[in-house]
Amino acid sequence: MANFAHRFIVSAALTAAVWLVVQLQPSPASAQECGGDCCENCDGGGDGSSSAPPITPPVTGADSSAGSINDLGKQRFNQMITHRVLGTVLLGVNEQVNCSDCVSAFGSAGSFSAGIHGRKELTPNLSLLAGIAYTQYSEGGYHVTSAPIGAFALRYDFTDWGPSRPFFDIGTILSPSENVRYRRSYVTSLGPVSVDGQTSSQNYGAYGRAGWINRISPRDEVAASVEVWQLWQRVKGYSDPTVAFNPFDATIATGTDKTNLVKVGGQWTHLFADNVEGNINGGFVQSFANHSGLVATVTGSDGTVAPTIGNQSWFEYGGRLGLRIAKGWVADLFVNGTAGPQPVGNTIHGGVGLRVNY
């Protein structure tokens, strides 16, 4: 009897153990249904909740976007200088100081330009220099897509002093309506961004020049001079255009850029044989009292951003080769440009002209 009871207890215990194991083992259907994503007793808690989604880091690049405003300031300074260089062509920068009345039609490349300029003797000592042109030019990220330019000046030449004598100029260059596009580029944690802002601008310049001319021979004229300029450039406010990705966009307020220049230069004009004219000119330019009117509001930056343009220096050069094709008619090939560090940089503008002397 005791043995029977012992065997019964052992048998019952084994049966209970087998039943428990079977109950705890998941069925193939439930395992397939779970798909390995069930988590009833995971470390995250026994309530079956899923893991939290990954955290996306914020996009960075606000500092780079604010820094791009400094580049805009450099573009606007370069625009003022290029406008002046193109305007001086209308004032006869590539021609001799003293010559007969003339009119010249011209076209240029490097910066597209087409126009007409000339000079008229008002008295034996006083001459009027004037010209108008339509131009398009670009440099370092900006594009002036349409710009009429006008210029005029008065020159007083002390001809009664003889072949070596002083002369004085006073004049202006103006462009009251320009269409311009400025490029702003910066870098974010998700990649680079580049946007072009479209707006309009106005450019004005006034100058005075004092120099000395010497007709050292019937074929040669040399001159040295000092010029003082003041330039103004007013740019209408605008905002970045709507693009697919520009997380740190900017708004530019209306403002006026200003600079003052002093140029010390010289020139030489020579007649080769009887029908070829040559002129070379150049000078050193120093800017001072520069002021940038650019003020920008940039998303992600505290307050406003305003660049500072320090004093700049560079060289300017020019030249002309003229062929006397008929009595009073001259075909000209000319070039003008700048050489120096940014924001002025190295630029070149060349063209051809047809001049008539009368």
Sequence positions of predicted segments:
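Short, aromatic- and cysteine-enriched interfacial helices/patches
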Residues: 37-42, 161-163, 216-217
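Outer-membrane beta-barrel porins/channels
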Residues: 204-216, 223-231, 241-242, 267, ...
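Repeated loop/turn-to-beta-strand initiation elements of outer-membrane beta-barrel proteins
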Residues: 124-130, 159-168, 219-222, 274-278, ...
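Cleavable N-terminal export/targeting peptides
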Residues: 1-64
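Extended hydrophobic secondary-structure segments that form protein cores and membrane-embedded regions
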Residues: 168-171, 224-228, 280-282
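Extracellular/periplasm-exposed beta-strand and loop segments of Gram-negative cell-envelope proteins
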Residues: 106-107, 132, 136-145, 176-204, ...
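Outer membrane beta-barrel translocator domains of Type V secretion systems
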Residues: 57-214, 336, 342-343, 347-355
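Outer membrane beta-barrel transmembrane domains
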Residues: 92-110, 149-151, 155, 251-358
